[in-house]
């Protein structure tokens, strides 16, 4: 190439980044510079001059390029003077002629394969590449291999720089493709990628100048080629199209369709007979062989025809099938007849007859398909097809039954089965059976064509070998055989495989098409082609997959086993040969029909060529093909020899990166862009550089993995030996095995679960490698096999005995564990094994290195076999984990003198178990040590990787039992002694500890390292002794009944809490054997307990995971002993916990000054199961330090609250119960939360389980009291009054120890954040998201019953974030309880007959009004106990209103049945969202009634006089749980009941969630008539006039409306206002209540008139209520208390505006409130706190906003100065206007200061909001799935309407047109299909949770070409669905086509734009904000546009998390209520154990 030409490249290619591949350099004409020349230094001045010249040239190039874009469409006149044709390839005249023609007109080039279509394409592409420097050239091919081939051709033919070319396929990421479109000029891609990029707007359509389409004959119908052209035309007509194909089409119509779709202006056609190509084409001999049917095949054919007649005759008799000869009918004709019958059914055929005819059609179609197989492929293919029908794999049940009744068919089928049954099984084995070539078994030729094919192939190889004597030549020949069906491909391959090694055959098929068929993956296909091309195989049997698109090399013989009707298929097959040498084509046809098909195909081919070449009038060409070259310019031909470099295929990025590091010095300059040493230290880097770094001298250019072995590609023995290629190093998978049996050190990224599993396998392999004979591991495990545990449905293979995550462990049989338990206990609570299996599935136990340990103790096992018989059933929990179980037995059975053997190995066992044991049904591995244990056993380790170096490193104490599981360390009597000295040390250290704050995060790593070196164990950790576990003792078993609830997942699979990052070990060893026999405890120990004043461990398994569903194993008959305690100060842990009492075995290793991840208390199930005692909170002083660590948690002993004064008494084992509790004082600045356990407040408390068959007063003389947590969980040290505890229990009940455990030294694990501590935490602390164990503090210990305690779980089920379907959860709870009580004959249903039960309210354990103090809390406030009020309660359910599941005196714990209905907060003009769980859509699916109303049943009428106090108690307790996260309109059930009319209340459709008898129902009704607010007088509704509006059509939506059925629970509301007037509903947005209440829609005018009226009358109706709130609880209570109880002094004139704003906000859909059930309340600063109160309690003042066109309303002025009005054009959702802040709290002590601070804070937020600009273009977001189904909609919006359309992952949404509106597009056929109805409804409900407005566009189905138009028939299902949608508030629009849909979308978006709610934020998120966007999208019920708003409006996630409700509402452009949801979610403090395992580990590691 000339220098001038290179300059053109450099000039016009400057828009590309000019790196190594500039156009000039890459053209191949320049010589590369020598390395020396590049090193020559230039003078500084000259260098600067060169740089400045380059800059000037670059600017000039860009300027010229910009000018060119404006002139002549970007055509370069200087370059356009010539068009270049390469001479480096032989010049062929036909190619030159076609290339010239294609430059100036859209051309279809038809050339036989192998004659240079690719060359012509390269020439045309190169010239357009030159002519249009700023344009794009696009090549499209249907398959990836063709795309890749064309890139290489363009480079090798024309020298187009590789740096300017790019390949894009579906595997390329969309974001990457967008960058490629901008940076590259010549693009090679598949058509679907092009369609996607055009739809996404990534492709610059206007810049495309040349479009080349390969395999153009595919451009039929709506193929992607056609879509691309249609889309491009919408943007520009100025582009050239070049279409390439070997054949134009199968017939004239197809050719015309291709011409029309691709805008073809001319055809360049060359056939094999054309004179100008004869000289260039090799001779291809086509032989047609006609094979007659044999006698056997003819006989079977005759029988088969008789079967066909019997089935087709009935269709012919009914006149639905044409009368023709049965043998001449075809499958296609029957299909056409069936379609005709469906379109025009006969009037005589109705009802069931129509179904019968359809079935007969289906049978006939199947039989005729078999007939064609028989004729073409033979008997075997027919048999395989019939087998699929008869064995049911094809799912044709009716056909199977009908054929089975036909005698002739069964005879034929049995005959075929005898012939081919063996081959059927062989074929099922897949392709691998081919290579075996079993010559012993005779091959059955199912068709005569097979013999002919065999003859042809053998003859070919014989003749070839005769002609080519050399071995190399013999291997060069290739044979390819084509067949249409896989079965015949398999048959041919099996036949030819008998002729090995002459014939090396392989099959080649496509991907798997179904479950039963196994195809080739793409990798396998490429591997087969590669081996075929390289000589691994010489014969390839292929389906149509091999016809086109793959470079299979030169083939000498092509055999077509069947004929193809389409000439295209035949031409493609024939094109595989004759490319480089003479080829031969053999077509084997059966006599008769197949021969006729072939002849017809050849005739069609000839007619097409004749029509195109001779009579051009037949085809209509595109007449407006652009010339592309400006007028006056006629490019002249310039032949040029183009040289090019070596084509380098594109490598994966990782290879390029590695090469760059290997060859970094190649050009003499080091690549400084790479970091020198990465993460290596200087010494490590030197070591790596010296030993491991690959250099050029190593001559290693590539590192490869071992050859992939495919199961389907065998025959490896014949594979030629791989020549060792120099410079290629193959990695080995085995050379590093010596390092793979233990985890190596890690940095930042820990080992994965998969890695640890692999390590465990390697350990076991290594251990078993040296064994001979029997496996020791198997022998060890075998002795523990319980045959009762083995079910017939599952027997685990031996090699899976370690698979603890087995999903198949499900048994319904009573296990040995249950049997053994029942033998030694009077009563038990056992979960079913099936429930256990649910947990086993969730656990992931990693293999442990215990083999060596087991060997050492195997002898002891045998010796202690008898002892073990009695107890191992308890320890061997029902599971399939042999490791942990065996380990426990080993340790138990060891004699005391042998337990200390080999400390290091035992430690090693624990080491491997670190972070490993997660099996809920297994006792964990327990290790024991003597006093001689080294200090290393208590040390902390920096990284878990080092822990595994058992031989080199010391073992850390955090490996000993660091589990969330209960750890049963059973001890013997001889191991017991007291440790009084520890008591003093503990108490002294505790006080010292409390003087510190937790260390900062930055200092923890150093501290941890020091602790790891210096901390020592000072005491012993003893192992259980089996001798003292006797079955005659009673076992204290705890029930874990919440098995099936969704809460089992909350603390995900018993996650180990002691991670490598948490450096201290915190143990909890429950001891539950302290009671008498009826309480399932050991009797002897119980006597000792009484002497010691010790009580049963009440929080036995506090930290047990909720997934645990087996009974709690306990320590039995054990005495206490010394416990290892870490004693350290700063560098060491403080000794804070004491274990003196003889019955408790606690290990307290809690270095509280280091990072300590304790075992947190599971508040969801464990607490529900076993009432907690002595849980406490550390006071706020400990939380105020800014350096408080996120994971710091406090592990407290249950005795640890004893004061320093108690020390001496403690040492003497005080006998007095009262002293133990009375002596507690402010040692820990901790106050015990003493509260009511009233039935109303047991939403928040955990009730103690006691004997249900006895009066509950009969307990020990110990009374405990716990203040209810109405504040932020401050806890006071209280005098704990003793109460009695009954020693005698009745057998058959479940007893769970209670208050005695208050003294149990088994400490309770609580996170530092403690239970529900949100509201009063420090501002600095509020930013932490610590795991919170909720309801831990509310633990009444007195007077409850078993059922209440267990039914607590039902409440918990409904409170978890996961529970969105309460009904299901209730059922699960019921099942869980019933299964729990199965073996104790005590179930929920049986409870009513369980004898007299006295249900004592536990809320009166303290006198009302008692003052409780928090000595060292933040403000030393005085708590005033709430006193009884005579004032009535507005709620209907003041008592313990539990809807019992049965008519039982035992009422389950009260729980809201439905998510909180914040109907006060309904949005401005939406009520689409369903506020009730059972919305009308759900009713439409599953139920008949409307949404259930939560009517609560009073438990007892005797407490009616206390309703007001009860309501306050209930609300106070609610505040602790939901706090600020719920709005003030809390009680949706009572709200709807109280103010609605009688008719509304007596809604017949109301469904109660539980059964209630008539008397109870009447009680509910009578109670509802009275108002507690008016001293139980009757409630009166004073109605005013009704505003009845009559509409002639559906009114348009109002911007502001009042939600239907919403009744304000405010005394301040106007009593004269009727409930009908309160509800203003847009008919298009009606909720499910509307139909029941018959509410009427009000126009904007009516609403405004009503507002004016109410403002005039509001003053007289005003009534204020005032209560005294406790200071500490005021912050929470005012956020949740109903306004009638609070003292909100609202100006009467503002009431209506408050109400209006209530409805200007959205209501929560049913599923979205589940998360709010268990919210905690972190303390926030006063500004945020006050703003939250304002947002929750007082609604903003907003004016009306117009709907479809702007209307100016008068601004409603408020009479109160602080009020602000907003212009009517501004959306209410964006402007939460503050009202009088002080009105939220009448108490001047809190309201005054916060009011003054809050107002400016809110004002600042208003000013910071950026209003959208009116002039900005309208934007619509489109879901990615719409690219395929709604392409024309997208293109019309973008190209025709000029809207900004962005394709985004919208999470199932179709179109988002504004911040609040989503549009779903559905076709009529989808709406008609009742199968999809439920799915569609679920989709709508999903959208309702995210958007305020929903619109559904019902689009008419597109008519396919040639289809007759059918009239649309409405169905009942269709109409009912539309009705339901309208009733649910969904707007329905109808469209006739996609273009009209685009018009509707445009109108909707413009309407939303006018209302100022359009999309105005950038839709593209840069890389640094993409993670924030993903985080926002992870928030439940957050739409993509909301996340996008938050991403752009908030500078960071931290900024959003610290924002107030108003800010979130404004910036996220959401309603106030949606902002509440977001706020609650962000501030919800949850237990990290709820995270999945990997996330939990990653989170903990990331916090290091």
From Swiss-Prot:
Phosphoserine carried by residues: 34, 1673-1674
Location of the Helicase C-terminal domain: 452-627
Motif (DEAH box): 214-217
Region Disordered, residue ranges: 1-45, 1433-1476, 1518-1540, 1668-1809
Catalytic reactions of this protein: ATP + H2O = ADP + phosphate + H(+)
InterPro entries reported in the protein's UniProt record: DEAD/DEAH_box_helicase_dom, ERCC4_domain, FANCM-MHF-bd, FANCM/Mph1-like_ID, FANCM_DEXDc, Helicase_ATP-bd, Helicase_C-like, P-loop_NTPase
A GO CC term assigned to this protein in UniProt: chromatin
Region annotation Interaction with CENPS/CENPSX: where it falls in the sequence: 661-800
Binding site for ATP: 111-118
Segments of skewed composition (Polar residues): 1-37, 1703-1745, 1753-1767, 1786-1797
Keyword Flavoprotein in record: no
Post-translational modification: Phosphorylated; hyperphosphorylated in response to genotoxic stress.
Pfam families: DEAD, ERCC4, FANCM-MHF_bd, Helicase_C
Any single GO BP term: replication fork processing
PROSITE patterns: HELICASE_ATP_BIND_1, HELICASE_CTER
Mutagenesis or variant effect for residue 117 to R: Abolishes ATPase activity. Loss of DNA branch migration activity, even in the presence of CENPS/CENPX. Loss of cross-linker resistance. No effect on FAAP24-binding, nor on FANCD2 and FANCI monoubiquitination
Primary location group: nucleus
Bias (Acidic residues) ranges: 1518-1538
Annotated stretches, region: Interaction with FAAP24: 1727-2048
Subunit structure: Component of the Fanconi anemia (FA) core complex, which consists of CENPS, CENPX, FANCA, FANCB, FANCC, FANCE, FANCF, FANCG, FANCL, FANCM, FAAP24 and FAAP100. The FA core complex associates with Bloom syndrome (BLM) complex, which consists of at least BLM, DNA topoisomerase 3-alpha/TOP3A, RMI1/BLAP75, RPA1/RPA70 and RPA2/RPA32. This supercomplex between FA and BLM complexes has been called BRAFT. Forms a discrete complex with CENPS and CENPX, called FANCM-MHF; this interaction stimulates DNA binding and replication fork remodeling by FANCM and stabilizes the binding partners.
Family: Belongs to the DEAD box helicase family. DEAH subfamily. FANCM sub-subfamily.
Clinical note on disease: Spermatogenic failure 28: An autosomal recessive infertility disorder caused by spermatogenesis defects that result in oligoasthenospermia or non-obstructive azoospermia.
Function according to Swiss-Prot or TrEMBL: DNA-dependent ATPase component of the Fanconi anemia (FA) core complex. Required for the normal activation of the FA pathway, leading to monoubiquitination of the FANCI-FANCD2 complex in response to DNA damage, cellular resistance to DNA cross-linking drugs, and prevention of chromosomal breakage. In complex with CENPS and CENPX, binds double-stranded DNA (dsDNA), fork-structured DNA (fsDNA) and Holliday junction substrates. Its ATP-dependent DNA branch migration activity can process branched DNA structures such as a movable replication fork.
Protein name stated in the entry: Fanconi anemia group M protein
């Amino acid at each position: 190439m000339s220098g001038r030409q290179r300059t053109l490249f450099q000039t016009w290619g400057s828009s590309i980044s000019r790196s190594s591949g500039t156009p000039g350099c890459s053209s191949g004409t320049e010589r590369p510079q020598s390395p020396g020349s590049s090193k020559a230094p230039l003078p500084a001045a000259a260098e600067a001059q060169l740089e400045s010249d380059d800059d000037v040239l670059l600017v000039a190039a860009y300027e010229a390029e910009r000018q060119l874009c404006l002139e002549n469409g970007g055509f370069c006149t200087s370059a356009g003077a010539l068009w270049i044709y390469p001479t480096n390839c032989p010049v062929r005249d036909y190619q030159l002629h076609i290339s010239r023609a294609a430059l100036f007109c859209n051309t279809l080039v038809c050339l036989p394969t192998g004659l240079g279509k690719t060359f012509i394409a390269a020439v045309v592409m190169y010239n357009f590449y030159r002519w249009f420097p700023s344009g794009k050239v696009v090549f499209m091919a249907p398959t990836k291999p063709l795309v890749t081939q064309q890139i290489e051709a363009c480079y090798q033919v024309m020298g187009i720089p590789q740096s300017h070319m790019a390949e894009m396929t579906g595997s390329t990421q969309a974001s990457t493709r967008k960058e490629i479109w901008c940076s590259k000029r010549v693009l090679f891609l598949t058509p679907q990628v092009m369609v996607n990029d055009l739809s996404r707007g990534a492709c610059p359509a206007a810049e495309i100048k040349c479009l080349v389409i390969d395999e153009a004959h595919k451009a039929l119908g709506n193929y992607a080629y056609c879509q691309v052209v249609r889309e491009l035309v919408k943007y520009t007509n100025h582009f050239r199209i070049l279409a390439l194909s070997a054949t134009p089409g199968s017939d004239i119509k197809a050719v015309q369709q291709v011409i029309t779709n691709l805008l073809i202006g001319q055809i360049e056609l060359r056939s094999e007979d054309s004179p100008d190509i004869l000289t260039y084409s090799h001779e291809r001999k086509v032989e047609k062989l006609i094979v007659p049917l044999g006698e056997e095949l003819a006989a079977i054919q005759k029988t088969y025809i008789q079967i066909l007649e019997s089935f087709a005759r009935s269709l012919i008799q009914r006149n639905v099938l044409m009368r023709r000869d049965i043998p001449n009918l075809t499958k296609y004709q029957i299909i056409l007849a069936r379609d005709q019958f469906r379109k025009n059914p006969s009037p005589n055929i109705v009802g069931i007859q129509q179904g019968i005819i359809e079935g007969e059609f289906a049978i006939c179609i199947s039989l005729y398909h078999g007939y064609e197989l028989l004729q073409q492929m033979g008997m075997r293919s027919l048999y395989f097809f019939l087998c699929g029908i008869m064995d049911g794999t094809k799912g044709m049940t009716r056909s199977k039954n009908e054929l089975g009744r036909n005698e002739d068919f069964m005879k034929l089928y049995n005959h075929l089965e005898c012939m081919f049954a063996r081959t059927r099984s062989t074929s099922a084995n897949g392709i691998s059976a081919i290579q075996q070539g079993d010559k012993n078994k005779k091959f059955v030729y199912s068709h005569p064509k097979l013999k002919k094919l065999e003859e042809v192939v053998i003859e070919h190889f014989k003749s070839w070998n005769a002609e080519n004597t050399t071995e190399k030549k013999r291997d060069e020949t290739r044979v390819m055989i084509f067949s249409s069906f896989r079965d015949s491909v398999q048959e041919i391959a099996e036949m030819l495989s008998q002729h090995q090694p002459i014939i090396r055959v392989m099959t080649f098929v496509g991907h798997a098409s179904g479950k039963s068929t196994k195809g080739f993956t793409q990798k396998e296909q490429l591997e087969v082609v590669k081996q075929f091309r390289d000589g691994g195989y010489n014969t390839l049997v292929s389906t149509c997959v091999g016809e086109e698109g793959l470079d299979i090399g030169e083939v000498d013989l092509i055999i077509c086993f069947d004929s193809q009707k389409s000439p295209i298929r035949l031409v493609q097959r024939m094109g595989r040969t004759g490319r480089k040498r003479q080829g031969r084509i053999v077509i084997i046809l059966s006599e008769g029909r197949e021969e006729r098909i072939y002849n017809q195909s050849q005739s069609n081919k000839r007619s097409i060529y004749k029509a195109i070449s001779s009579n051009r009038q037949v085809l209509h060409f595109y007449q407006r093909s652009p010339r592309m070259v400006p007028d006056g310019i006629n490019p002249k031909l310039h032949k040029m020899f183009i040289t090019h470099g070596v084509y380098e295929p594109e490598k994966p990025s990782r290879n390029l990166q590695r090469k760059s590091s290997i060859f970094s010095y190649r050009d003499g300059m080091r690549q400084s862009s790479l970091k020198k040493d990465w993460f290596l230290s200087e010494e490590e880097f030197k070591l790596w550089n010296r030993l491991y770094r690959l250099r050029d001298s190593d001559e290693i250019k590539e590192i490869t993995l071992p050859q992939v072995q495919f199961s389907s590609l065998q025959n490896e023995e014949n594979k030629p030996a791989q020549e060792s290629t120099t410079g290629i190093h193959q990695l080995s998978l085995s050379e590093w095995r010596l390092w793979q049996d233990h985890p190596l050190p890690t940095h930042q990224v820990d080992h994965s679960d998969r890695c640890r599993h692999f390590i465990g396998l390697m350990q076991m392999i290594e251990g078993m490698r040296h064994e001979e004979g029997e496996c020791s591991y198997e022998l060890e495990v075998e002795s523990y096999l319980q045959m009762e545990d083995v079910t017939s449905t599952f027997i685990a293979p031996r090699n899976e005995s370690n698979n603890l995550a087995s999903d198949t462990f499900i048994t319904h049989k009573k296990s040995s564990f249950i049997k053994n338990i029942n033998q030694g206990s009077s009563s038990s609570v056992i979960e079913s094994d099936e429930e256990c299996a649910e947990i086993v599935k969730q656990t992931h136990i990693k293999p442990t290195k215990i083999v060596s340990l087991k060997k050492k103790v195997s002898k002891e096992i045998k010796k202690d076999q008898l002892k073990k018989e009695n107890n191992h059933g308890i320890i061997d929990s029902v599971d399939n984990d042999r490791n942990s179980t065996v380990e426990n037995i080993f340790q138990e059975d060891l004699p005391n003198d042998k337990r200390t053997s080999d400390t290091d190995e035992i430690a090693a066992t624990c080491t491997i178990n670190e972070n490993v044991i997660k099996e809920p049904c297994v006792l964990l591995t327990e290790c024991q040590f003597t006093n001689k244990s080294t200090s290393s056993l208590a040390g902390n380790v920096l990284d878990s990787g080092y822990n595994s170096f058992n031989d080199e490193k010391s073992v850390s104490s955090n490996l000993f039992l660091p589990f969330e599981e209960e750890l049963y360390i059973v001890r013997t009597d001889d191991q017991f002694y007291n440790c009084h000295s520890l008591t003093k040390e503990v108490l002294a250290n505790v006080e010292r500890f409390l003087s510190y704050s937790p260390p900062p995060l930055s200092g923890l790593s150093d501290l941890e390292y020091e602790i790891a070196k210096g901390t020592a164990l000072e005491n012993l950790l003893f192992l259980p002794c089996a001798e003292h576990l006797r079955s005659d003792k009673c076992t204290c078993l705890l029930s874990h009944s919440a098995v099936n609830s969704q809460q089992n997942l909350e603390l995900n699979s018993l996650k180990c809490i002691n991670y490598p990052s948490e450096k201290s070990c915190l143990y909890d060893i429950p001891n539950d054997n302290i009671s008498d026999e009826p309480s399932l405890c050991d009797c002897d120990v119980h006597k000792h307990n009484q002497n010691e004043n010790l009580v049963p461990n009440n929080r036995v398994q506090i930290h047990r995971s909720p997934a645990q569903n087996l009974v709690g194993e306990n320590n039995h008959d054990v005495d206490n002993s010394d416990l290892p305690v870490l004693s350290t100060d700063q560098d060491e842990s403080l000794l804070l916990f004491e274990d003196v009492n003889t019955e408790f075995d606690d290990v307290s290793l809690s270095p509280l000054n280091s990072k300590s991840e304790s075992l947190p208390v599971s508040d969801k199930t464990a607490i529900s199961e076993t009432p907690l005692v002595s849980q406490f909170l550390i006071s706020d002083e400990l939380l105020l330090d800014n350096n408080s660590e996120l994971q710091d948690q406090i592990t407290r002993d249950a005795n640890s609250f004893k004061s320093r004064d108690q020390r001496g008494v403690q040492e003497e084992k005080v006998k007095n119960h009262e002293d133990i509790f009375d002596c507690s004082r402010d040692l820990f600045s901790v106050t015990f939360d003493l509260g009511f356990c009233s039935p109303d407040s047991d939403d928040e408390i955990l009730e103690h389980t006691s004997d249900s068959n006895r009066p509950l007063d009969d307990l020990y003389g110990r009374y405990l009291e716990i203040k209810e947590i109405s504040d932020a969980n401050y806890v006071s040290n209280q005098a704990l009054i003793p109460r009695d505890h009954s020693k005698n229990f009745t057998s058959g009940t479940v007893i769970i120890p209670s208050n005695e455990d208050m003294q149990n030294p088994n400490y309770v694990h609580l996170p530092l954040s403690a239970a529900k501590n949100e509201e009063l935490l420090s501002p600095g602390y509020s930013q932490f998201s610590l795991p919170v164990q909720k309801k831990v503090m509310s633990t009444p210990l007195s007077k409850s019953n078993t059922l209440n305690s267990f039914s607590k779980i039902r409440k918990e089920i409904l409170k978890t974030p996961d529970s969105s379907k309460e009904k299901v959860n209730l059922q699960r709870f019921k099942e869980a309880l019933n299964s729990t009580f199965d073996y104790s004959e005590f179930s929920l249903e049986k409870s009513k007959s369980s004898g007299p039960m006295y249900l004592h309210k536990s809320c009166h354990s303290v006198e009302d009004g008692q003052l409780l103090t928090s000595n060292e809390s933040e403000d030393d406030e005085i708590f005033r106990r709430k006193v009884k009020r005579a004032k009535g309660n507005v709620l209907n359910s003041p008592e313990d209103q539990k809807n019992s599941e049965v008519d039982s005196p035992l009422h389950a714990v009260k729980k809201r049945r439905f998510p909180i209905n914040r109907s006060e907060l309904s949005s401005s003009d939406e009520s689409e969202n369903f506020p009730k769980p059972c919305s009308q859509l759900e009713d439409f699916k599953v139920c008949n009634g409307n949404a259930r109303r939560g009517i609560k049943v009073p438990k007892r009428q005797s407490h009616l006089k206390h309703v007001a106090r009860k309501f306050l108690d209930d609300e106070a307790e609610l505040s602790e749980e939901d706090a600020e996260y719920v709005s003030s309109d809390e009680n949706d059930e009572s709200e709807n009941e109280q103010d609605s009319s009688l008719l509304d209340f007596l809604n017949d459709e109301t469904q109660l969630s539980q059964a209630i008898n008539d008397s109870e129902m009447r009680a509910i009704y009578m109670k509802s008539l009275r108002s507690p607010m008016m001293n139980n007088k009757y409630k009166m509704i004073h109605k005013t006039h009704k505003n009845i509006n009559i509409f002639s059509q559906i009114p348009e939506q109002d911007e502001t409306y009042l939600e239907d059925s919403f009744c304000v629970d405010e005394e301040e509301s106007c009593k004269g206002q009727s409930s009908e007037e309160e509800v203003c509903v847009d008919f298009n947005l009606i909720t499910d209540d509307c139909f029941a209440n018959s509410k009427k829609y009000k126009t904007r005018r009516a609403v405004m008139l009503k507002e004016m009226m109410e403002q005039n009358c509001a003053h007289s109706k005003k009534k204020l209520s005032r209560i005294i709130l406790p200071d500490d609880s005021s912050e929470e209570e005012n956020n949740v208390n109903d306004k009638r109880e609070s003292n909100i002094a609202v100006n009467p004139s503002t009431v209506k505006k408050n109400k209006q704003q209530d409805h200007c906000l959205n209501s929560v859909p049913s599923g979205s409130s589940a998360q709010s059930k268990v919210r905690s309340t972190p303390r926030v600063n006063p500004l945020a706190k006050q703003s939250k109160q304002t947002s929750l309690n007082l609604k903003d003042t907003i004016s009306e906003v117009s709907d479809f066109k702007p209307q100016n309303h008068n601004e409603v002025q408020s009479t109160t100065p602080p009020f602000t009005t907003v212009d009517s054009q501004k959306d209410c959702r964006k402007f939460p206007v503050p009202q009088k802040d002080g009105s939220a709290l009448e108490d001047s002590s809190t309201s005054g200061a916060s009011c003054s601070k809050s107002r400016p804070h809110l004002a600042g937020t208003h000013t910071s909001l950026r209003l959208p600009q009116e002039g900005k273009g309208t934007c619509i977001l489109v879901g990615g799935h719409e690219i395929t189904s709604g392409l024309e909609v997208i293109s019309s919006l973008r190209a025709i309407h000029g809207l900004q359309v962005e394709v985004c992952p919208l999470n199932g949404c179709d179109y988002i047109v504004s911040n609040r509106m989503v549009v779903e597009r559905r076709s009529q056929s989808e709406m008609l299909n009742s199968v999809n109805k439920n799915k569609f409804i679920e989709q709508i409900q999903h959208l309702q949770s995210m958007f305020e407005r929903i619109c559904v566009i019902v689009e008419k189905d597109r008519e396919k070409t040639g289809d007759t138009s059918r009239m649309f028939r409405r169905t009942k299902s269709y109409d009912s669905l539309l009705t339901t949608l309208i009733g649910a508030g969904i707007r329905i629009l109808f469209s006739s086509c996609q273009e009209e849909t685009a018009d509707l979308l445009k109108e909707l978006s413009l309407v939303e734009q006018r209302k100022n709610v359009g999309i105005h934020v950038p839709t593209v998120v840069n890389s640094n904000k993409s993670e924030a966007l993903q985080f926002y999208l992870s928030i439940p019920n957050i739409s993509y546009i909301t996340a996008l708003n938050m991403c752009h409006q908030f500078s960071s996630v931290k900024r959003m998390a610290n924002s107030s409700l108003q800010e979130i509402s404004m910036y996220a452009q959401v309603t106030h209520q949606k902002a509440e949801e977001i706020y609650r979610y962000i501030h919800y403090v949850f237990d990290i154990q709820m995270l999945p395992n990997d996330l939990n580990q990653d989170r903990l590691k990331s916090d290091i």
